A protein has these predicted regions:
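Glycine/small-residue-rich phosphate/adenosyl-binding loop
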Residues: 1-48
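C-terminal helix-cap and adjacent tail motif
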Residues: 27, 91-127
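Alpha-helical transmembrane segments of helical membrane proteins, especially in multi-pass transport
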Residues: 51-52
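Short hydrophobic alpha-helices that are characteristic scaffold elements of the AMP-binding
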Residues: 57-61
Length: 127
């Protein structure tokens, strides 16, 4: 029922905006404005991801259902349809609507796996 959601939004990041900002005089000495490969972590992706999480949490907070999903096919068609500038990086999509009553038989295989223990995913001091 994912594609039946009344709202499906596309999430994009703009690496060019970060290059422009870090080319300004107060940031130029970092050399992060030179090219995207200068960034050890692509913060345009990080920031777009955090903003998406905030959107998901806000939707839930007002009683809506929301989920993030990847766009694995059809990106070229989406870009053409919505006239997306070439420098924009597609992160994924968000579906927002009304939550369905949960039916455990409809859940995917990953939802049926037992949760890992905190000790399996949290590290203290070292790996």
């Amino acid at each position: 029922h994912l594609l039946d959601a009344p709202v499906i939004g596309l999430v994009f990041a703009d690496p060019h905006a970060y290059l422009e900002r870090y080319s300004e005089p107060d940031k130029a000495k970092t050399k992060l404005g030179d090219e995207t490969s200068a960034w050890p972590t692509p913060y345009w992706t990080v920031d777009a991801s955090f903003a998406t999480m905030q959107l998901l949490l806000a939707a839930h907070d007002v009683g809506l259902g929301a989920l993030f999903f990847g766009v694995f096919n059809g990106e070229d068609e989406l870009r053409k349809e919505f006239k997306v500038p070439v420098q924009m990086q597609l992160i994924g999509a968000v579906a927002i609507g009304w939550p369905m009553l949960e039916n455990l038989t409809d859940r995917g295989a990953s939802a049926k796996r037992p949760r890992r223990k905190p000790s399996e995913i949290i590290r203290e001091g070292s790996f």
